[in-house]
Amino acid sequence: MNIRKRTGEVVPFQEEKILNAMKKAFSGQAQELDDRVLDEMLSVVLKRLPENGGLTVERVQDEVERVLMECGHYEVAKAYILYREKRAALRRVRAGLAREVGDDALEDVLRQIQKDFEEEVYPLSALQLKFESFCKPAMTMEAKMEALTKAAVELTTVEAPKWEFIAARLLNHTFSKRNASRWTERGVKGLYEKLRYLTDKGLYGDYILARYSREEIDTAEGFLCPERDTLFTYSGLDLLLKRYVIQSRSREPLETPQEMFLGIALHLAMNEASGRMDWVRRFYDMLSRMEVTMATPTMSNARKPHHQLSSCFIDTVPDSLDGIYRSVDNFAKVSKFGGGMGLYFGKVRATGSAIRGFQGAAGGVIRWIRLVNDTAVAVDQLGMRQGAVAVYLDAWHKDLPEFLQLRTNNGDDRMKAHDVFPAVCYPDLFWKLAEKNLDAPWHLMCPHDILTVKGYALEDYWGEEWEKRYLDCVSDPRIGKRTVTVKDIVRLVLRSAVETGTPFAFNRDAVNRMNPNGHAGMIYCSNLCTEIAQNMAPIEHISTEVRTENGDTVVVTATRPGEFVVCNLASLSLGNLPVEDDAYLERTVETAVRALDNVIDLNFYPLEYARLTNHKYRSIGLGVSGYHHMLAKRGIRWESEEHLAFADAVFERINYAAIRADTALAREKGCYALFEGSDWQTGAYFEKRGYASGKWRELAETVAAQGMRNAYLLAIAPTSSTSILSGTSAGIDPVMRRFFLEEKKGSILPRVAPELSLDTWWYYKAAHLIDQSWSVRAAGVRQRHIDQAQSMNLYITNDYTMRQVLALYLDAWRSGVKTIYYIRSKSLEVEDCESCAS
């Protein structure tokens, strides 16, 4: 027997649905009825239904009402009637909205919204009222859908935050209809045909269809779960459709969100030797469930012809004209493909230094940094956004005072570089003096003078050896000095930090002390977002020769590649993961580590220097987002010992899972080239971090025997963009506010703390209201488990004194924190890095 639904659809009749409806009617009145009595009433209802067709939902419900009344269950029957009236009212609202918009298919979307969201808080009648206020005569159906979506966005409030999910569903409905129409016009059906079309148009990398058969693409299409689109907030879906999915050259999106995730998975699993389609599925699942986000370049560029997947690069600028211009050229090429850059200027001679023996000839680092600044502005990624670069200088460099005023608004504009991000590399000695005696002298020197007089580069040392050589240089009268007090430098640093958010801080001794690959090199600085700490070395010019090749005269320049650092990033979305479930967490970390390792081999490198270093070290940076989201969901206050203990446990588990996954990869695919002699191999990595339990000792032995696939594993990026995609909080930062409205390009976007509710409200304390000493302590706790660094911001208000800000820097140094990113003053707007938005 069949039954006709209210939509007109005819489906098989299921009598158990009647039984369930009657049970709900009784339980709604707090009444329990014997199953035998219910079965008897059901039997009466069934006997009264027509057997010769024409059965409808309305007829069934009418008979249920009559039977309830006849059996004396008047209150239940009354409630049942009222329930039917309520459902009828809901149907009228959604049908009316669909009719006003002129889109019959919209009714199904609205029906699901009514099913998934509480009617008392999210009534479609409120959406209809708001929508009608936006409607104008002669609006097209698409314009009406935009107005309906805008209405849902504007209904988002602290009391009703889930309207942003409803707005996302409406946006997705509009996009899906438009996208389906585009492909129908092109006569394209199915995923394989779509990929063939995109490949032929030069929008998809031809390597995907070259490596996967049609059968495999068809299998992958079966992995797609369109229902996961409901995980998006409006802000996340809007961002994804505008920036991440493949677009035509006229900027129309041609990929669904799920097709984007699957395309990334196909790319990342491409080289898997066995079980490749299983890895495609695992990569797709972790991305589409929003449990892991890849960095913005990976999300944007995987599956495309120019698949530059890395976020940031770091170069050591040599002290030569050729070397400086080579570094600037390297930055331009990196920026062209969307990468951010960190440049270490600590080797470049200071203002007034000698050139070829001519005293006072050198112009110093500022003029070169201005050249970098202009390159960042000029190479703007097809007009999308200008390049991004952090410039690092040592705390003892002679040009430091001018460097610390690069972005401030006062002073000589010819000495400014407003589009770069300055950062200072501090030795322990500086903080020791700042702690004990701010009036202590601090001697600034030129690296070229030191190299000329002493025969060594002071910046090539760290820790006690650096301090011994620094004091030796201070006492050598042949080396010119610019002597100031520690207080003078601190004052310049803090003034700039409060005014501009920079300079970033890099604690070079803490970094090198915990470097697992200190046997192979030195870390001079970090990257654009201060989360990367890997061995560095400048590119060296070897020779320039004139040759004859095929009858032509050619000039050949040979260089030694140095160590040009590359950052391959992804983030665990802690707010979306069951972090207490060891098995689930380990499987997720294993999948993410494997995906990142594959990035190294599948990447399109803008420079050969980058490719060589990346294959030599195979460094990755697995980080986290949703940190505050995770705490709030569990009822953990930011300013509490419970927070510190929980963070310690979670990050130890993440680190354990990452190392375990990495050594298993080494057994399967081989170690990185410099494993022998590393802290991984000697066990010093585990000793330095106090990992002494039985399971850690066992893991250390396994690592020593099997090796490590990747030289560096963990690094916490800011995730400013990808955290919006996954509907969680950014990186390890507290939320800025529980709720606020952001204006972007003429529209108002609601920003809501993830899963904001009465349960989480009090655990979402705003960033600027938090005692920052708790943030510093938490960073110190996490740092023990992170082999690289963290993009950690400090949030200050206008009430902070300079001494209080200095105290935070000192607390961070004492806690072993390696880097500090922005000082975010409440009155200051700072730019977020899009490259490291993993």
Question: Where are each of the predicted segments found?
Answer:
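Terminal amphipathic helices with adjacent charged low-complexity linkers/tails
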Residues: 79-89, 93, 163-195, 426, ...
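Alpha-helix capping and helix-loop boundary segments enriched in small/acidic/polar residues
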Residues: 6-13, 33, 101, 139, ...
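Conserved, charged catalytic cores of large soluble enzymes
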Residues: 180-274, 357-371, 383-387, 392-527, ...
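Internal maturation/activation junctions in enzymes
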Residues: 286, 304, 328, 588-611, ...
